[in-house]
Amino acid sequence: MPDRRTELMDAALRVVADKGMKGLTHRAVDAAAQLAEGTTSNYYRTRAALVEAALGRMEQLDGQLLQDLAPSGPPGTVAELADQLAGLVLSLTGKHAALTRARLALSLDQPDAVKAGHFRLVGGMENTLAALGVTDAAARARDVADYGDGVMLHLLTVRRDGQPDAAAIAAAVRRLLAP
């Protein structure tokens, strides 16, 4: 059973995913968490504190997803990495689509607040690429992150009725990382 703060932040992310940032209020989080009115404001006195905590929870969930997709550790080859990233994209646009919608809304509303998490992700990708011997790892890490973000945006918007193709996503990542 999650603790109360985790429960509230999961509810806050659901609210943002469903209603956008304008819908994120203490009362909306209380309702989404099915808790008494005023509960959220007891834990997070201001909207800024609520947003900051939601961003922290989002980053925590992202870390859990990455760990779940690569339980045996970092990939040993570019092909393994491409497959893992394709799996992540499918997860973030399928089972965890609400988390991605919340991420997009938070990113548009609070770009400076999500910047640090983005750079940690890209930095981790850069380290992984360098360990795999990929040349120009920094630029390629940015390219892969940009590609993944674009694919997720399209799968949640203009291509939401289509079936995502893990093999095609992995092939595109391999092309981005080819010598």
Please describe what each predicted stretch is.
Residues 63-64, 83, 95-102, 109-135, ...:
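Amphipathic alpha-helical packing segments from all-alpha helical-bundle domains
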Residues 89, 102-107, 144, 148-151:
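Short alpha-helical scaffolding segments that buttress acidic/His motifs in well-ordered protein cores
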